[in-house]
Amino acid sequence: MERPQPDSMPQDLSEALKEATKEVHTQAENAEFMRNFQKGQVTREGFKLVMASLYHIYVALEEEIEHNKESPVFAPVYFPEELHRKAALEQDLAFWYGPRWQEVIPYTPAMQRYVKRLHEVGRTEPELLVAHAYTRYLGDLSGGQVLKKIAQKALGLPSSGEGLAFFTFPNIASATKFKQLYRSRMNSLEMTPAVRQRVIEEAKTAFLLNIQLFEELQELLTHDTKDQSPSRAPGLRQRASNKAQDSAPVETPRGKTPLNTHSQAPLLRWVLTLSFLVATVAVGLYAM
C-alpha cells in the first residue's frame, strides 16, 4: 500500500499557523524600522505610543476571551493567570502617562479597526479567537525578554522593571515548557477542516492588522517628509485628524472616545514608534 508523502500528512494546527504566517512575518522582519530598533533607536514618546496601542489590543482580546472561556472552541487554551496582559499594561501606562492615563492615551484609526475585528470574532465567530490569542500571546512571550532588554538600555529604565511589566510573565516558570503546553492544547481543539482553514486565514488577518498600524504611520511620514520645515508640522496634524474623521465608525472600548494625539507628536516620534511596533511583532513571532 502506498504511504502518504510527508507533505500530505496532516499538520498540527500550531505548525500550520506558523507556516501560514511566514510571508507576512518576512514583510515585518525586513522592515528598516526593525533594524532601527535593534540599534536602540527608540524614544520615550515612541515607546509610550506602543504601550498604549498594546493596551487597546489586549483589552479587546481579553474581553472576548472572558466571554468565550467556557466554550469548547476556546476553553482548552484559557490561561488567564499565566497570559493576560491588561493589568500589566495598566501598570505600565500609569508609569508612562501618569494617574490620568486613560484620558490621554491615543487611539488611532488602525487601532480601532484591530479592536473592531477582535470584537467581531469574539461575538460572531469565537472559533477564530484562538488565532488572535496564539499570534499575540506566544509572540509576546517569545520575543518579550529581548525587547525588554533593548528598551531598558535605550531608555535608561531601572533594572527593577518599572514601565516594562507587559514583558514579564511572573506566573510562567519556563516559557519553553509553557509554549509546548499551549501548542498541545491548541492542537487538541476539535474543528472541521473548513473551520481549521478559517483559523489559519484569521491568523494571517491578525498579522496584517498589525502591519496596517505601521502603514498608517508610514503614510503620515511619506506625506510630511516632503517638506522638513517646522511650518509644515500642522500638515501632519491635519491629515491625522482627517484620517480619524473619515474612517468608518467603530466600537470603542468601554465607550471611550477615540483620542487623537498625532497633533502633539513630532515627526521623529513616528519613525521610532514604527521601529518598535515592527520589532514587537516580528521578533516575537519569529521565536514562536
UniProtKB/Swiss-Prot annotation:
Post-translational modification (record): A soluble form arises by proteolytic removal of the membrane anchor.
Database matches in InterPro entries: Haem_Oase (IPR002051), Haem_Oase-like (IPR016053), Haem_Oase-like_multi-hlx (IPR016084), Haem_oxygenase_CS (IPR018207)
GO biological process per UniProt: apoptotic process; heme catabolic process; heme oxidation; negative regulation of ferroptosis; response to oxidative stress
Enzyme class: oxidoreductase
Stretches in topological domain Cytoplasmic: 1-265
Source domain of life: Eukaryota
Record's bilayer topology term: Single-pass type IV membrane protein
Modified residues (Phosphoserine): S229
One GO molecular-function entry: heme oxygenase (decyclizing) activity
Cellular compartments per GO CC: endoplasmic reticulum membrane
Site feature location: Important for catalytic activity: D140
Transmembrane segments: 266-288
Residues the record lists as binding heme b: K18, H25, Y134, R183
Catalytic activity: heme b + 3 reduced [NADPH--hemoprotein reductase] + 3 O2 = biliverdin IXalpha + CO + Fe(2+) + 3 oxidized [NADPH--hemoprotein reductase] + 3 H2O + H(+)
Keywords: Apoptosis, Endoplasmic reticulum, Heme, Iron, Membrane, Metal-binding, Oxidoreductase, Phosphoprotein, Transmembrane, Transmembrane helix
Pfam families: Heme_oxygenase
Region (Disordered), start-end ranges: 223-260
Main subcellular location: endoplasmic reticulum
Enzyme Commission code: 1.14.14.18
Compartment(s): Endoplasmic reticulum membrane
Family: Belongs to the heme oxygenase family.
Subunit annotation: Homodimer and higher order homooligomer. Oligomerization is crucial for its stability and function in the endoplasmic reticulum. Interacts with FLVCR2; this interaction is potentiated in the presence of heme.
Domain free text: The transmembrane domain is necessary for its oligomerization.
Protein name according to UniProt: Heme oxygenase 1
Organism: Pongo abelii (Sumatran orangutan)
